[in-house]
């Protein structure tokens, strides 16, 4: 028998590379087999045309030199001039190439930041429209080599949109809002520290996926970033990013003229305010001449903004746009503006209406260097939402889409969720503006409405963890974001497989296994967290992590489900509801207005229906809930065995790191499944046709065991404990024992123990069979996993440990001893004994 929950013993395997910690991401440049003619085809010289010190051209040459050395043990010299293509790779801008190589092959037409890569006829030519484009081409060439692709190619590629940014929600104290990969790499104790050593590697990763801008601080901004010493620090950050073609920008606090500048107003039309922002902007550009611009969150979730002074959001955005215009900077102005104190008692209130209500009347009133940054859905990064109708309502305004790489509502990197298939439901959706093809991707590029600016922003939130995001597999989402921002019609699985080959090597089983797991992960998470468009049924008032469907309703945040004993869902129709459907162009509105034509996966987003409403699948809503939550959790169980099939094919450190998370996810998916099903079973009173919900024949409730030093505890929310109760030690210094005589047939079982591991202590548990040790463990999720922790017994802290292949004899006595620590009273929920092949 063996325990599966926290870090397991690392076993060295013959032939494996030295253990890796994830710091290199996909830029590992791991050894690639290349012999004979292949080896001879590799360049021995690298010609960098007209490089300046620390320019993207110089970086491109260094990257290729390093890549060739690490992948093929080949030392290539770097030379600053020359046009000979024999055994050489030539890197440069189009202008430099035409000047230095007048008789060379003509280069096809390139758009801004585009590049031409040619490896035919024994040549390697990487020519960019700009220095940044040439660097992108160098990374493209290295990507091919690292995947074992030596086929001759010749093609040009250019970006889908000019803005391809990432946002970091880093705070000045070094913490991070909704970051699950450690502390900030930019800030500490209110300042920008001297040690910025991780920033260069982040710049490399971003450049390799063609990201050209970064906002380094939280949208809930602290005005102290604008102090002179911190502006100096921003200059140091920008100096690190600049050679990689990534421009630095910052988030602003709208009230800074008052909170930092000492003015008695922050009215955007006040001359003193205008002058103050002009001076601050000038000071920033003195230090960072190529600063990207500003990101602004205003009049949302308590943040200050122009409406305080009865000014419009456009007047607020234009304040910054005019200060930036002489310097060439842009304003990304977030459309995430809504009232979080609206009353659910009013049937017609709807947070989803807010963006169009606020911004549509302002179309055409923004300066040309303003870009309205719009979240992909009308609410907030949910597991499934319809596309935001605001994209279809701004004809005369630049727009960008806002995605989330950090998994705020989607498992917080403790659950595997590959996000591009979700994003593609938004990017490819045809909004049919004026009855014409209008996919979202063509609106944000500026193509559909002939706008000069537009593009992409993603909240990433890398941190000091060596995996960057808290999980090795989560990095696939950052990689894919960059690839899609360049070309949004790429296939999500193709992108994923490029990332797998660069990250984990070329073994076919590794490729197929991680592909299968990843492509199944978003549908599985949707199934066990919230489906039919009901949103992610997480605790929206606390951690945004574990299940708590009741938290959606009864408050002013507007993420309502309107679930009661008879019906569920938001009526957003024109006929009877909030009229949200009317914000879409007519062809789309007509689809969503009618239950019969609304897709099942968005039914509860647009309609309030009885639990017995039949779906297009033929199932009732409530039975679909039950079935989907079981199906999703069942899929999550398979991730463990799939990953275990790769033992010996992946270096031990990364293998064990991922395995720990997948084992945890398998257990937590059951917590999700049971919590949601029990909640709606209790609310609706409708039984599961398959008699699974509320029936757990393999479980023994902890409160039904013989207790010594333990006492029963009513868990809140009730559905996050099996049978609503758990047990805790009588005091925080009392060791507790729970024991029971087993009435199961003799045989081998997997012994699962569900417990609660919350912040504020590291309890210890030991399990015995007839006084024979089965296993022991510690409540140390805070040291092992990435998600936001709870200080309660709830769906966030609920965890399962499993001991496999335990030999049980009927009549054996199972005993669990819990030793509390700190605030944590060694809580237990239940034990389960599962015959092999049975999922609880």
From Swiss-Prot:
Locations listed in the record: Secreted
Gene name linked to the record: aguA
Function: Alpha-glucuronidase involved in the hydrolysis of xylan, a major structural heterogeneous polysaccharide found in plant biomass representing the second most abundant polysaccharide in the biosphere, after cellulose. Releases 4-O-methylglucuronic acid from xylan.
Main location: secreted
Glycosites: 222, 310, 465, 527, 576, 682, 732
Protein name from the UniProt record: Probable alpha-glucuronidase A
Leader peptide range in chain numbering: 1-19
Species this protein is from: Aspergillus clavatus (strain ATCC 1007 / CBS 513.65 / DSM 816 / NCTC 3887 / NRRL 1 / QM 1276 / 107)
Pfam family membership, one: Glyco_hydro_67M
One CC-aspect GO term: extracellular region
């Amino acid at each position: 028998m063996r325990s599966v929950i926290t870090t397991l013993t690392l076993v060295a395997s013959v032939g494996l590379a030295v253990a890796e910690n994830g710091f290199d991401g996909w830029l590992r440049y791991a050894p690639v087999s290349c012999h004979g003619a292949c080896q001879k085809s590799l360049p021995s010289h690298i010609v960098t045309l007209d490089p300046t010190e620390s320019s993207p051209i110089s970086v491109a040459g260094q990257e290729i030199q390093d890549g060739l050395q690490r992948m093929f043990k080949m030392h290539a010299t770097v030379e600053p001039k020359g046009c000979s293509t024999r055994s050489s790779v030539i890197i440069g801008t189009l202008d430099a190439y035409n000047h230095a190589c007048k008789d060379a092959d003509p280069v096809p037409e390139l758009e801004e930041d585009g590049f031409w890569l040619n490896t035919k006829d024994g040549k390697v030519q990487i020519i960019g429209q700009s220095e940044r484009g040439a660097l992108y081409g160098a990374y493209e060439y290295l990507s091919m080599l690292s995947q074992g692709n030596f086929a001759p190619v010749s093609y040009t590629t250019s970006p889908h949109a000019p803005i391809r940014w990432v946002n970091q929600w880093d705070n000045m104290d070094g913490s991070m809002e909704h970051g699950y990969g450690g502390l900030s790499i930019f800030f500490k104790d209110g300042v920008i520290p001297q040690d910025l050593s991780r920033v260069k590697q982040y710049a490399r990763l971003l450049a390799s996926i063609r990201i050209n801008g970064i906002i380094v601080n939280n949208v809930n901004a602290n005005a102290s970033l604008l102090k002179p010493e911190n502006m100096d620090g921003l200059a140091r950050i920008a100096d690190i990013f600049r050679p990689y073609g990534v421009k630095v920008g910052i988030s602003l606090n709208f009230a800074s003229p008052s909170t930092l500048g000492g003015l008695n107003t922050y009215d955007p039309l006040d001359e003193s305010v205008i002058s103050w922002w002009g001076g601050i902007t000038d000071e920033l550009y003195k230090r960072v001449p190529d600063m990207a611009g500003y990101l602004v969150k205003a009049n949302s979730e308590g943040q200050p903004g122009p409406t305080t002074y009865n000014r419009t959001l456009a007047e607020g955005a234009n304040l910054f746009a005019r200060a930036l215009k002489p310097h060439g900077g842009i304003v990304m102005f977030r459309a995430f503006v809504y009232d979080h104190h609206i009353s659910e008692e009013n049937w017609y209130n709807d947070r989803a209406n807010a963006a169009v209500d606020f911004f549509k009347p302002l179309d055409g009133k923004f300066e040309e260097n303003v870009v309205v940054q719009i979240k992909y859905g009308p609410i907030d990064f949910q597991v499934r939402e319809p596309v935001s109708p605001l994209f279809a309502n701004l004809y005369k305004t630049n727009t960008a889409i806002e995605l989330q790489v950090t998994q705020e509502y989607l498992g917080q990197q403790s659950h595997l969720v590959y996000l591009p298939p979700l994003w593609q439901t938004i990017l490819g959706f045809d909004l049919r503006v004026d009855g014409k093809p209008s996919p979202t991707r063509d609106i944000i590029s500026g193509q559909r409405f002939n706008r000069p600016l537009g593009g992409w922003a993603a909240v990433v939130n890398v941190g000091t963890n060596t995996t960057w995001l808290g999980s090795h597999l989560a990095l696939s989402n950052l990689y894919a974001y960059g690839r899609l921002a360049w070309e949004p019609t790429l296939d999500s699985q193709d992108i994923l497989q490029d990332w797998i080959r660069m990250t984990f090597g070329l073994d076919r089983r590794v490729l197929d296994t991680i592909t299968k797991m990843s492509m199944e992960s978003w549908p599985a998470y949707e199934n066990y967290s919230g489906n039919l468009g009901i949103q992610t049924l997480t605790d929206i008032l606390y951690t945004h992590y574990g299940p708590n469907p009741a938290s959606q309703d009864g408050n002013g945040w507007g993420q309502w489900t309107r679930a009661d004993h008879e019906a569920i869902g938001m009526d957003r129709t024109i006929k009877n509801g909030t009229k949200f459907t009317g914000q879409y162009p007519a062809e789309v509105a007509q689809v969503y207005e009618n239950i019969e034509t609304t897709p099942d996966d968005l039914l509860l987003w647009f309609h309030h229906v009885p639990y017995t409403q039949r779906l297009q699948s033929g199932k009732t809503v409530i039975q679909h809930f039950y079935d989907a939550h079981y199906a999703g959790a069942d899929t999550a169980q398979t991730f463990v065995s799939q990953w275990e099939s790769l033992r010996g094919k992946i270096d031990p450190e990364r293998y064990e790191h991922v395995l720990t998370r997948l084992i945890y996810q398998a257990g937590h998916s059951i917590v999700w499944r049971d919590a949601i099903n029990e909640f709606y079973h209790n609310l609706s009173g409708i039984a599961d046709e398959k008699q699974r919900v509320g029936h757990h024949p393999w479980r023994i409730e902890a409160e039904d065991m013989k207790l010594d030093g333990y006492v029963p505890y009513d868990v809140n929310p009730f559905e996050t404990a099996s049978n609503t109760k758990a047990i805790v030690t009588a005091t925080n210094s009392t060791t507790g024992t729970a024991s029971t005589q087993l009435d199961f047939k003799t045989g081998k079982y997997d012994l699962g123990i569900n417990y609660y591991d919350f912040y504020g202590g590291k309890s210890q548990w030991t399990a015995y069979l007839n006084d024979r040790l089965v296993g022991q463990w510690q409540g140390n999720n805070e040291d092992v996993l990435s998600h936001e922790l709870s200080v309660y017994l709830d769906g966030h802290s609920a965890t399962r440990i499993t001991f496999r292949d335990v030999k049980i004899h009927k009549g054996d006595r199972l005993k669990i001893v819990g030793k509390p620590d700190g605030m944590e009273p060694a809580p237990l929920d239940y034990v389960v004994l599962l015959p092999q092949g049975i999922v609880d």
